[in-house]
Structures are given as structure tokens and as C-alpha cells.
Amino acid sequence: MDGARRMQTEMPLPDLIEIVPLTSAPKVEVTVPGSKSITNRALILAALADGEVTLDGALWSEDTQVMVEALQKLGYRIEVQPDPGESGNRTIRVTGLGQAVPSGGTEGQPLELFVGNAGTAARFLTAFLCLGRGVYRLKGVTRMHERPQAALLQALRELGYRIDSGNDRLPLTIHAGGPINGRCRVSIEESSQFASALLLAAKAGGWQVGIDGEKGAASPYVAMTSSLIEAFPNQGGRFMIEPDASGGSYFWAAGHILSDDGTAPVSVARWPDSGWQIDAEFPGRLPLPESMSRRDDLGDSIMTAIAIAPLAKRQSEFTELGRLRLQECERVEALRTELTKCGASIEESGDTLTVKPSALRGAEVETYEDHRMAMCFATLGLKVPGIRIKNPACVRKTFPTFFQKLATPVPYGLGATLRDGDGNDLKPEQLFDY
């Protein structure tokens, strides 16, 4: 069974889940799994380390599993153990091989690696594999084959590597070895992951990387990568991965929309304070300001803010959303379409969405195979009656325990009632399975 099919059958969630609103906000501190962004960066750095690295608090989800499986297929020794403190995490032990990335295949029989719809795995492995020898082929699911890769491929070709792709997207074939040059520049207008991919491998490759577009090296996820490289135990040791701030935003948002007095009865344990995750700023953005930028204020959690904006007391404007169009789905259009279906007054102009206070109603929400669409609208359903989430299993990408967290009784969850499409109540243990 290939990686795509296997991961689609590991989460036996119903085709549709209805969220029953809570009548009040529970006073609870929940845990959320580790940061996806940090976990997949740490896996690459651990593979390049001179010695064994133990990653504590690592996220265990589709995106991180495809990275682990790709590294294992390359020949890395990786041990995965349960995390007693968080069911969505694992302790991952990686035996690094320094700069000796295992060799690939041949021109006629390249070593093939599957990356699903994980942008981090697709971009990071593309640069990482250039450090090896031989021929590698990367492929993913259909949506990953539609997502941009051109700026990264251009930079790697500038370094002297041969990468074959019919349209500068996946699937692609990497002919490792080289480089001829030691300098390149990369544009991050479409994705900052292009720069992060190059920076993670730059020391081993002897590359000097210039970054163009947006805020350059100061762009939040690029800055995260640089900070992580500096802090990482590259001679071996232990590294603690902090909780995922994007995933935590749903619980801060839930507490906010359920609270009548502006307090924050729902909080997230071990909330990140390293400054690495821009979405750790989310609690400070509540109540929502009049204007918010995806580039300057929030990352993926700006989707959470947009989803709850119709419940705000004043109009909210969300700007510089262009990158959302190039991710798991066309997120700007998806948010506008599904919020409108729920009764929201929302206007799209260029890469800006303007959301007005609205009386919302229940609806059957398309998720577009996008984990964040499912989680955003499930959060909204904790307040708005009749929200029904189609294809809820898409949360397996980054937060497989999400619906279980909603349904688990206080103090370990929110204690919400979730139902299947036939109106049957779902138990927490029915909402999560690897």
C-alpha cells in the first residue's frame, strides 16, 4: 500500500462531523501537539548532525510521518516512541550521518520518495537531496504537484545542480553532486519555505544564500529557521520541540468567542515564548483589531482570525493574503465561500478580505482537503449551531487529535458534543486513531 492510501485509511473518522455549540466557555488548559514547522526542520538538521539526536515533543502527523519515512527510505536510522504527555507527539531518535547524505539511485532507476501534500517535506528534501550522490525522484499527491517550487529549483540550478521537472513543480528528479557555484539567491514571494530549505542545507553544502522578497531574512518562518539552526545540537544531544502555535490558535479562539466578558477561560499549556513562531502572537490579537496582515501580524492562524471575525463587534480587514492562495487549497476563496454560506458579510478585493459583524447560521462546510479549513470552522461551530464539517479526517495532516481534544471532557479537552452525519454522538476514542 502506498503512502497516500495508507495515511488516508489510518483515521477512521466519519465523512461528516457536526459540532454542537457549547453553552459556556470551559475553564481549562489544554495541550496541543508539537510544532509541525519546527519538527520537520529539526528532522533535517538531525539527519545532518554528527551523532544521535533525540527530538522530544515532536509532532506525529501526516506531514511529519512522510518526512520520517523519506529519511528512513534513504537509510537513516530513526526510532519513534510514544510521548506520555501528549498523544499527538512522539519522541524521535535520529542517528545523524553528518554531511554524508545516503546515495540515491540511477538515471534509469532513481530512488523515489513520497511527500504527500507536505510543503515542508517537499521543499526541504529537494535541497537536502542535492547534498547526496546519484538520482532521486520526489512526488506527492495531486495538490502538491500544483503548488509552487520554481524559485527553489532556480536557486539550486544557480548553485549548479541538475533538477528535471516538466513545469518546475513536483514530480521532479534531482541529479545530486556538485555544486559548481557556491552562491545563489532565492525569492520567497510565493513561499518562505524555499529559503528555509536552502538554509537548512547551506552549511553542509557550503552555500551562501541571498533572500529576496517580503521581509527577506527577517520573514518570520525564515527567521525561525535561522534561530533553530543556531540552537540545534548538531553534534548530537536532545532538542525539545515547543507546542504548535497555529494549532493552539483554535483553542484561544474558542475561549474568546464563548466568553461574554472578554476573559480567556481556555488556554494552551507551555505556550511558546521563544519568538520562533509568529502565530504565538495570536492570543494578543484578541479581541480582533480593525486590520491585520498575514505578512506582519500572523501566519497560518490568520485563517482562525478570519473564521471568527463575523462574531466580532466591529469590521475587520485582513491584508496581504496572497500566499494563502498557493497552499493546501485556494484558501482566500475557500474562506470567503464557506463563511458566506454561513451567513457572513465578507468582501474580497485583491489579496484583502473585509469581514463585517454578521448573524451566522449553520451550514455544511467544504474543507477542500485542507486541515486548517476543517479546524477553523469546527472552532466556529462551538458557538454557531448547525456547523457540519465535511471530510474531517483531513486534520490528520498536522493535528490528528484535534476533534478528540474538542470532545474529551474537561480538564483534558473542551467537553464538546460531536455527532456523525446520522446524528449519533461520537465518543472521544472514535475521533482519533493512527
Question: What is the meaning of each model-derived region?
Answer:
Residues 2-434:
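Structural preference for solvent-exposed beta-strand-turn elements
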